Amino acid sequence: MSELSYRGLFDLSGRTAVVTGGAGILGRHFCAGLAESGAAVAVVDLQEAAANELARDLGKRYGVRAIGIGCDVSAPDSVKAMVGRVVHELGEIHILHNNAAGKSDDLDAFLASFEDYSHEQWRKIMAVNLDGMFLVAQAVGKQMVAQGKGGSIIQTASVYGVMAPDHRIYEGSFYQGRKINTPAVYTASKAAVIGLTKHLATYWADKGIRVNTLTPGGIEDGQNDEFQRRYAARVPLNRMGARHEIVGALLYLASDASSYVTGQNIIVDGGLNAW
């Protein structure tokens, strides 16, 4: 028998991970999972104070190096500066979790009907959800190529990037007290992320850089009981997901456990898309 440690394949000690959207609802769980697995973590978020606070907590809790960085992923100069700071403070980058996604401060505009959706709002969301993915992958990928040691890039999509939302479940549905839907810009941007992942997986394969998509299904987070009931009725496991349930797939994709996996979309949705 080989002396290979299968548990050891998931060990991220000695590696540095960059997580965009790192202080967000799912992002903070992703950062915690990477840190607990031994990685140094750069918590990158538009909300710099939240990123710094989480980085301090990760360092204390897991004994790893962690830094918080404020960054607008839709701004090329901000992304370039972010990568430079990570390399300066933490060294080589081994893992990128391209996770930032945009919603609008103007929820009326973000949740408007398709017929009334403004082009300005469409572009604003695309600037983060797709342009931001491109800019961060480009900058970190360039750094990984220069390092010459490969790497792993994971890009967050959504189950609505592989299937359309069931608009019927939004009847009488609310999120934190307001009526909700899933706008077309979200669906379109997340589908594009999956396409970008496949392209980069083949483009950087000869550099040893693996690129995969992580696709969560619906996560329980402040939706009203009616929405949760209707959503769960469409899921074989009969419930929405919990935030921590997405982390295992990330750790698999970030680690040597997935060393022969690239260009794939790992869907964690309770079986929703299996019907």
Where are these regions (language model features)?
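The beta1-alpha1 cofactor-binding region of Rossmann-like NAD(H)/NADP(H)-dependent oxidoreductases
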Residues: 48-49, 70-82, 119, 244-245
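Catalytic Tyr-X3-Lys loop
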Residues: 94, 115-135, 154, 186, ...
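Canonical Rossmann dinucleotide-binding motif of NAD(H)/NADP(H)-dependent dehydrogenases/reductases
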Residues: 9-42, 200
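Short, small/polar-rich loop/turn modules that mediate ligand/substrate recognition or access, typified
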Residues: 96, 205, 210, 261-263
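A conserved structural motif in NAD(P)-dependent oxidoreductases
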Residues: 235-246, 257
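Catalytic loop of short-chain dehydrogenase/reductase
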Residues: 106, 119, 145, 154-192, ...
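Active-site Tyr-X3-Lys motif and surrounding loop/helix of classical short-chain dehydrogenase/reductase
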Residues: 81-88, 107-127, 230
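Short C-terminal tail/terminal secondary-structure segment
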Residues: 2-11, 111, 172, 251, ...
